[in-house]
Design a protein with these regions (language model features):
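Alpha/beta enzyme core
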Residues: 1-60, 68-89, 122
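Glycine-centered helix-coil hinge/cap
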Residues: 53, 94-95
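Short donor-sugar binding/catalytic loops of nucleotide-sugar-dependent glycosyltransferases
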Residues: 64
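C-terminal extensions of enzymes
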Residues: 87-88, 95-133
Length: 133
């Protein structure tokens, strides 16, 4: 069973996780609920990926609300994303059907974003697609 460590924001913490046997990390600031000044997860993807290399699992959790957010995470180095709050909104809205609706919307937005950026597959999602405002 793979072991993933959640709540990682610092490169040195990521290294410690792997030195101690973790199979991957989950970049998370716990939705900003713990510390209102916590670093946004999106800003930590690149430094963490640089620290751990391309072969280690890096999942992003936090702040993902749209398909464009998914593309940004992948472009910056995430292997996968986790979503929480949007799923809860869907669950509250209409139970299982609401969750399915939220997931359908996110998938459609992500595919649309890939099309609009000229990406035919995940391998074509690259760092140059993301710019800071």
């Amino acid at each position: 069973l793979p072991v993933l460590v959640k709540g990682i924001l610092r490169p040195d913490d990521a290294s410690l996780c792997f030195e101690n046997g973790a199979d991957g990390i989950i970049v998370s600031n716990h939705g900003g609920r713990q510390l209102d000044t916590a670093t946004p997860t999106l800003k930590q993807i690149e430094p963490l990926r640089k620290e751990i290399g391309k072969d280690k699992i890096l999942i992003v959790d936090g702040g993902i609300r749209r398909g464009t957010d998914i593309l940004k995470c992948i472009a910056l180095g995430a292997d996968a994303i986790q979503i929480g709050r949007p799923v809860l909104w869907g669950l509250n809205y209409s139970g299982k059907e609401g969750v399915e609706l939220v997931l359908d919307i996110l998938i459609k937005e992500f595919i649309e974003t890939m099309i609009l950026t000229g990406c035919r597959n995940l391998n074509e999602i690259t760092r140059d697609l993301v710019r800071e405002a």
